[in-house]
Amino acid sequence: MKDKKHVQLPNGLIKTDSIVPKDLLVYLAIKRFEDWETHTAYPSLKEIAKVCGCTEKTVSESIKRLVATDYLEVEKYKKGKKYFFKKYKGFEAFALEFLDRNDLSFTEKQYLAAQQQFLILENNLGKTTYSSYEMSNKINMSPSTIQRCDRSLIAKEYLTIIPTKVKDEETGLLKNEKIFNLEKFGQAVVFVLKNHEKSIQELKEENESLKKNQDIILREINKLKTARGEAELIL
């Protein structure tokens, strides 16, 4: 059975104008230390920076933006800080295996984290026909940085780009499809959770169907009882 250990990233976070992809990775790094009962975490800047693969200064700047956009609360705690996470509805899951990968750079991880919610997920793959410019507008990362990440991910065999027969409405050129092998770079958890969610939904629907059948049977029994009572009165 594949590991379901993961960290959750709120879906709406990257849609906030002042938030940039590196902030998402910092959020994930802090959340990795979360106490699930209290929804608080106590990592030092050094620990957060180590998980991210960046400097403590970068971490501090990201924390300021996360606090300003109300996704994170920070309080002084002893010699360090205590972090509180705000409630959210939809989320993307990121495996600890993904966060710990040494063959992905800080920039590549933030890119993959930011764009995951815009992918079509199926068969351990994540697909999109968004161009670098279109994705740039969605995740607040420059097209040149996205293209650089794509080239690196192709070299690592984590990404394949193939031509499609779909035309871009603006340029008239044929679109390319980017296919990310999520399982290969540690994100199989997405599909484990997806299948788990599907199983829960199927059980829920099955229970609802059984309940409906039970209700129908009870109504029929009551009708028979009523009819029997009326027959006895006639006799």
Language-model-derived ranges and their functions:
Residues 1-235:
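Electropositive, intrinsically flexible nucleic-acid-contacting patches
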